């Protein structure tokens, strides 16, 4: 009997890999181990569940059981993988030992919750999985005032979604502007204004210091001596790859699980994919690099070593009141910007020292120009 491909994790990366494998091979044995129900869903949709008034059940596209049947996999639901033995090519899960031919770590990431003072810290909510959405949905529905920690991609999307759902929202961000790791301040300012127009209180260059319980809700204090009285607090302060299993198995781990161009870790026959993987020194928690990684890894697992090649990729900021799209390098080592701003939005092009287009950002109605600029970017790079 052939030994199986074993995948730890049942998120987007894991299931995209399975779908890709099954397009060319319907028979090779695949086992999936997950500590949740294994339902198939699109995680980015979680940033918009409140304005759309969706329940956890409505986010699911296929139940775990239906997915397992449709894609011919053995799904080990609600199963905790305790350890990996790279030398023996085994994993231990719920006390049982399983042998693999190839092992894929698709363990995902978790939301970083900074260390705050106060007795309310344990009540800080996170929204990074269907399981977490199920756990916090009623608390969010019952809340009138919500504070979101972090004005990056997820935090900004979530704050606007909650505002569109009728909540009073405060967004606290340590940097001087929103999406600071993605674009300069002059581009994100209109997005900040769009948030404010929806009623979001945007508090920049400030950090949450303490979260304390009150008789009803919480008192949040910041480094700039602001105090907010809210019904709940959500952390969107970034994602941290889940690397504990890899670390305990003595795999090379830096920010994420370090992989080579074939997505293989420092151990033979063990690969990493998705939010947990560190590729060329970067953790790329976006759909397009995960899709491309899954396509390459599927070929490798089926016997054809395939190196991952990552082109320029488009990122969409899903803020419906002020949509943003960007690609290429838009945050570091920009020699000059060419910026056109009018009532339709912003079109900003980034150039290097050789006057080559290296990236762009378009906003609002200007997003219709994104694909033309994307083609130009790919032509010059």
UniProtKB/Swiss-Prot annotation:
Keywords: Cytoplasm, FAD, Flavoprotein, NAD, Oxidoreductase. Gene3D superfamilies: 3.30.390.120, FAD/NAD(P)-binding domain. GO terms for cellular component: cytoplasm. It comes from the Bacteria. It catalyses: 2 reduced [nitric oxide reductase rubredoxin domain] + NAD(+) + H(+) = 2 oxidized [nitric oxide reductase rubredoxin domain] + NADH. InterPro entries: FAD-bd_OxRdtase, FAD/NAD-bd_sf, FAD/NAD-binding_dom, NO_rdtase_NorW, Rbx-bd. HAMAP family: NorW (MF_01313). NCBIfam families: PRK04965.1 (NF003437). This is Nitric oxide reductase FlRd-NAD(+) reductase. It comes from Aliivibrio fischeri (strain MJ11) (Vibrio fischeri). The lineage of its organism: Bacteria, Pseudomonadati, Pseudomonadota, Gammaproteobacteria, Vibrionales.
